[in-house]
Amino acid sequence: MLPWVRTSWWVSKLLRESVSREGRLLKMKTNWTKIFAVMLASATLSFAVLAQAPDNGTQKPAAATPSADQILDKYVAAIGGEAAWHKLNSRIAKGTIEIPAMSLSGTVESHEKAPNSMLVVVNLGGAAFQRGCDGTTAWSDDPQNGLRTETGAEADDSKRQSDFYHQVNMRKYYSKWNLTGTEKIGDHDAYAVEATSTAGDMDKLYFDTQTGLLVRAITTVHTPQGAMVIQSDLSDYRDTDGIKLPFTVHQSSAQSDYTLKFTEVKHNVQFADSQFAKPATEPAAQPAAH
């Protein structure tokens, strides 16, 4: 899952709980991350725009339908290629989150460090949410559940999404790729690829037939409340330090929808490993002195 889909995947998990805003308790069972990745990027699942050949007015022969493996290869090339990605070892991204149905807006910030550390912080409606993984332990901290360690399928999800090079390591996380046809996604003709994860989930990825960009991803996320299917739509791709990233991710599920817009991205930032570790719990209350 690509960066923003990974991030939005984590955001959606954070926002499934309730937050207090202006004296009201809002139940927020929203989607994602991950995004690809976004966020997951996850998304997250973001793909670079390939340069378009100029139209010289001549009729071009119809291109042969590529295989699923060729589509994946085009994706890796489109986002800059493995060499460009491995020149980067960390990332900080800042942006905004909007939930129109609840008239809520806030900020989101993600920190990522190779090989597999990630931290997402969301401030929304006066409440703060955090989700982190140090490569070994995945954890979250939110107003409803407090600080907790993730377990089972939820923890496995978080650890997979924390791979900094997930987008060029996708063959590591998907055991099977199957091209099912071509579909229209907005203004894009897209190849629809069913991808079976090593965890057994079936994701559906839509790649622009011309650019190789991922324009939509339908993925399964595991939470303490059960599995959740999320649709991520990616747009506004920009060049960033030799790679391309989508700066807008819109996510929707059966519960709600929201939009992440990233405004600032920096690579090769220095992070201490301790920043991604689960915070120490508050000390137990001491008995009163007699």
Can you say where each PLM-predicted feature lies in the sequence?
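Tryptophan (W) side chains
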Residues: W4, W9-W10, W32
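Short, Lys/Arg-enriched N-terminal segments with co-localized hydrophobic residues
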Residues: W9-K27
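Bacterial N-terminal signal peptides that target proteins for export
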Residues: V19, K27-M39
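Bacterial N-terminal signal peptides
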Residues: A37-A48
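Compositionally biased, proline/threonine/alanine/serine-rich low-complexity intrinsically disordered stretches
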Residues: L45, A51-P66, Y75, T281-H290
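N-terminal mature ectodomain segment of secretory-pathway/periplasmic proteins
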Residues: A63, Q70-G146, Y173-G181
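Gly/Pro-enriched, hydrophobic low-complexity segments
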Residues: A127, D189-A280
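Acidic/charged, solvent-exposed loop-and-adjacent secondary-structure segments enriched in E/D, K/R, S/T
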Residues: W139-H166
